[in-house]
Amino acid sequence: MPKMKTDKGVAKRFKKTANGFKRKQAHLRHILTKKSTKRKRHLRAKCLVAKSDVPAIARQLPYA
């Protein structure tokens, strides 16, 4: 049986941890002037992928 391929786009965006998959939050790329400093600071924090999305991410990262 051939090796399963890793989805490289997913591999660059998510990291496997003991608690699930770590990801970066959205809304911090552009149009930042109207967002408050507090909002931007909170968006810098990493967060975990939602429980319902974990199986899909795990399928795309077979060796994670």
UniProtKB/Swiss-Prot annotation:
Family per record: Belongs to the bacterial ribosomal protein bL35 family.
Keyword terms of this UniProt record: Ribonucleoprotein, Ribosomal protein
Species annotation: Shewanella woodyi (strain ATCC 51908 / MS32)
Molecular-function GO terms, alphabetical: structural constituent of ribosome
Protein name: Large ribosomal subunit protein bL35
GO biological process: translation
PROSITE patterns listed in its UniProt record: RIBOSOMAL_L35 (PS00936)
Cellular component annotations (GO), alphabetically ordered: cytosolic large ribosomal subunit
